[in-house]
Each structure stands twice: as C-alpha cells, then as structure tokens.
C-alpha cells in the first residue's frame, strides 16, 4: 500500500503534462516568487523541457510553443474551477477543448503487447496531438471520482497547480516548501497570540489576593 491513488497510465501522463505546462507557462506566483511566462521567442525550450522523456524528444517551433502556452492558460482555468468546487465550469471548458482539438479515441499497440487506449487530434501535429490528449485526460478525470484531485496551491500567494494522488484528498499545497511555509506562519501566529495574552492576576492558589477580591 503506497497511500496514493494511481491514475490510468495514459491519463496520468497527459494530466501530469497539463499540470506542468500550466506551472511552466502561466503567470502568477511560485511560492512567494512572482513568475511570468517565458517571453515570445523563448518558449520552445520551456515547452520542450516539459514534454521531453527518455524516449520522446519532440521538435518544436516557436509558433507551436505559443499555441501550447495559450492552451496552458485555458487548462489553468480547469484546475482553478475544479479546485473551487465549480466542476460544471471545469467540464464546460474541457468540452470546448475536446471539440476544438478533435479528440478521438484510438487503440494503439502497447510496448508489452496488446493495445492501449489513447486520444488523438485531427492530425498528427504536436499542438493538436497534445491538445487532444490533455483535453481527453482532463475529461476522464473530471468525469470520474478524480474530479476533486485537480488543485491550486493554498499557500497564498502561490497559485501553482497540482494533482492530488493521496487517498484522503488531503493535499493542499503544490510542494513541501509551500506546506512548510504555511505551517511556520501558523506557528508564528500562535506564538504571537500567546505572548499577547493578558497575564492572570490570580495567586498561586488559583484565588485572587485579598485586597483585589475585596475591591470587586
């Protein structure tokens, strides 16, 4: 028992890529640090760093990187809506993405034999391919009991997104760094509150001294 929920392997790959594209390509805060998307003309490297695996090194133009950056902005809206409990809005955005990218199911040969269900776009271009795959992965997550697992970090001002793979849906932060920052802030607030608490005028016996009690 690992204490984690395991997504279907294909769903996990595409939703994980969706999450990392949002965090790499959209503006906001990473922890307390303000972040901006890579400037136009320098996005291909950032997108490639997200997509690359040992067996997959895509060629990518700046135009394609710009299109995937625009996709990341819309995927952020899905995470934000799902995290706030507005699953209907998240579903509406995903439905639009499914239609736009022409996501269609297809059985592809698997490495170990047999076949694996994948989703393809209307053509084999990298933008339509990943757009369709991400839209389908998000659709399968939102259309199941995984809907509540698309989250936005709650360590203000951080707004990086994450996928909650815990069994108890207990994840609230994008990283241990943000979790530690919030815990430290709570501890400081409690300590400050204790220091400000008025001292009791009771004596060691728990009763007021005679002169104070008689003055009441």
Protein language model regions, located:
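Short metal-binding segments enriched for Cys and/or His
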Residues: 182-192
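Cysteine-rich micro-motifs
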Residues: 168-179
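Short helix-coil boundary/hinge micro-motifs
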Residues: 1-152, 156-164, 197-216
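Feature targets compositionally biased, intrinsically disordered low-complexity regions
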Residues: 169, 192, 202-205
